[in-house]
């Protein structure tokens, strides 16, 4: 399931991908 931790991790990974 998606916990707040998972959402933060996904959000962070997405942001890093966009930055690159």
From Swiss-Prot:
Its EC number is 1.11.1.7. InterPro entries: Haem_peroxidase, Haem_peroxidase_sf, Peroxidases_heam-ligand_BS. Signal peptide: none annotated. Binds 2 calcium ions per subunit. Binds 1 heme b (iron(II)-protoporphyrin IX) group per subunit. One of its GO terms (molecular function) is heme binding. Keywords: Calcium, Heme, Hydrogen peroxide, Iron, Metal-binding, Oxidoreductase, Peroxidase, Secreted. Coiled coil: none annotated. It catalyses: 2 a phenolic donor + H2O2 = 2 a phenolic radical donor + 2 H2O. Ca(2+) binds at residue 15. It comes from the Eukaryota. It is an enzyme of class 1 (oxidoreductase). Heme binds at residue 14. Its cofactor is Ca(2+); heme b. The keyword Metal-binding applies. It is found in: Secreted. One of its GO terms (cellular component) is extracellular region. Transmembrane segments: none annotated. GO terms for biological process: hydrogen peroxide catabolic process; response to oxidative stress. Belongs to the peroxidase family. Classical plant (class III) peroxidase subfamily. Removal of H(2)O(2), oxidation of toxic reductants, biosynthesis and degradation of lignin, suberization, auxin catabolism, response to environmental stresses such as wounding, pathogen attack and oxidative stress. These functions might be dependent on each isozyme/isoform in each plant tissue. This is Peroxidase 1. It comes from Betula pendula. The lineage of its organism: Eukaryota, Viridiplantae, Streptophyta, Embryophyta, Tracheophyta.
């Amino acid at each position: 399931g998606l916990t707040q931790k998972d959402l933060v991790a996904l959000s962070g990974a997405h942001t890093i991908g966009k930055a690159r």
